[in-house]
């Protein structure tokens, strides 16, 4: 990590007292790697959350909550279900949100929880063999590394421990029928913003520095060949520390990422406490800390059959509009 990037993270840590007043991909079980295109046992027709019902109720509830109006219009593209939350690091206040409590399947975003849980259960220096799993999982969104750590940590117990510790109310383990699929963890934009706030103000320095340091060094090309520089990396100026997530675009990208210039399943919608999680439509998420000012979480369900390129363009525009509206 460069000195400037380290300085940025230290700057974030410097404003933590102010927060006290306010303020990934898919899982691949070790036994086999699920194929999103051939696993017919899990190919139920997806239900579209956000078209009404729970999403409509959330929209009405959020409309009643006082949040500063963005400076400019932030429009969710047609056919996309989006939940987002932007938190001002200095004041700790949520400055923009939309369907922030709507549940999405996490894809690789859950890898943050996997890493934090590991680091908090294992005190002291990280052994080289475990660092060889944690670092590529955080920087390159490596699925095999995540699966190894997921199984070692007790699978869904990782999510339950983190939910209790951080106070996450919409986050839940994968469905009982799919315990190995960490990418089926349910998350919300509000909960993921809480995760970043936990890292910034409550986590031990060694945990904060390890996780945010690696997210600050996220590679352009993910381990599976997808280009993970969409959303925040393309929409806002550096420095940033990011964790992206994608699912539903196949195991191999149509155009492999190059530094010079994932697997998913479809099992329809599962109702979790009246807040349905859609496991069918593609998801594309961008999350992270922007400089020493903002936490941004944008979770999206894309139209069925959407290409990765078009989805990335939509998420990038949404992240850019959102950033400009609060910058």
Each PLM stretch: what is its role?
Residues 1-14:
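N-terminal export and membrane-targeting signals
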Residues 2-5, 24-39, 53, 57-82, ...:
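Penicillin-recognizing serine hydrolase domain
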Residues 19-22:
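C-terminal motif of bacterial Sec signal peptides marking the signal peptidase cleavage site
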Residues 88-90, 108-110, 122, 141, ...:
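A mature extracytoplasmic/lumenal domain signature
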Residues 92, 103-126, 137, 296:
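Active-site SXXK
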Residues 96-100, 140-145, 174-180:
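Flexible glycine/proline-enriched surface loops and loop-helix/loop-strand junctions
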Residues 120-136, 141, 153-155, 207, ...:
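Short, well-structured active-site flanking segments
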Residues 147, 151:
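Glycine/small-residue-rich loop that forms an oxyanion/phosphate-binding "nest" at active or ligand-binding sites
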């Amino acid at each position: 990590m460069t000195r400037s990037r380290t300085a940025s993270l230290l700057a974030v840590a410097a404003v933590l007292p102010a927060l006290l007043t306010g303020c990934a991909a898919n899982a691949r079980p070790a036994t086999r790697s699920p194929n999103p295109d051939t696993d017919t046992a899990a190919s139920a027709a997806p239900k579209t959350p956000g078209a009404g019902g729970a999403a409509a109720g959330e929209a009405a509830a959020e409309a009643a909550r006082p949040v500063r109006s963005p400076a400019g219009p932030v429009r969710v593209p047609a056919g996309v279900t989006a939940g987002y939350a932007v938190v001002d690091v200095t004041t700790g206040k949520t400055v923009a949100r939309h369907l922030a409590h709507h549940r999405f399947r996490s894809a690789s975003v859950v890898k943050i929880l996997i890493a934090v849980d590991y680091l908090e259960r294992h005190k002291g220096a990280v052994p080289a063999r475990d660092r060889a799993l944690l670092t590529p999982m955080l920087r390159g969104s490596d699925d095999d590394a995540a699966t190894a750590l997921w199984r070692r940590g007790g699978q869904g117990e990782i999510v339950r421990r983190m939910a209790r510790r951080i106070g996450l109310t919409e986050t839940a383990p994968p469905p009982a029928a799919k315990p190995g699929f960490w990418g089926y963890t349910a998350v919300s934009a509000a909960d993921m913003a809480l995760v970043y706030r936990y890292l910034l103000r409550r986590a031990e320095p060694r945990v904060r520095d390890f996780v945010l340091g690696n997210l600050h060094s996220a590679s352009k090309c993910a381990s599976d060949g997808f280009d993970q520089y969409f959303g925040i990396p393309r929409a806002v100026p550096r420095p940033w520390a990011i964790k992206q997530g994608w699912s539903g675009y196949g195991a191999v990208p149509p155009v492999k990422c190059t530094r010079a210039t994932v697997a998913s399943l479809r099992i329809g919608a599962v109702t979790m406490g009246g807040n349905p999680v859609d496991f069918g439509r593609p998801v594309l998420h961008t999350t992270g800390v922007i400089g020493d000012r903002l936490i941004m979480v944008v979770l999206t369900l894309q139209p069925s059959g959407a290409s990765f390129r078009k989805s990335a363009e939509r998420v990038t525009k949404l992240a850019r509009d959102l950033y400009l509206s609060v910058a």
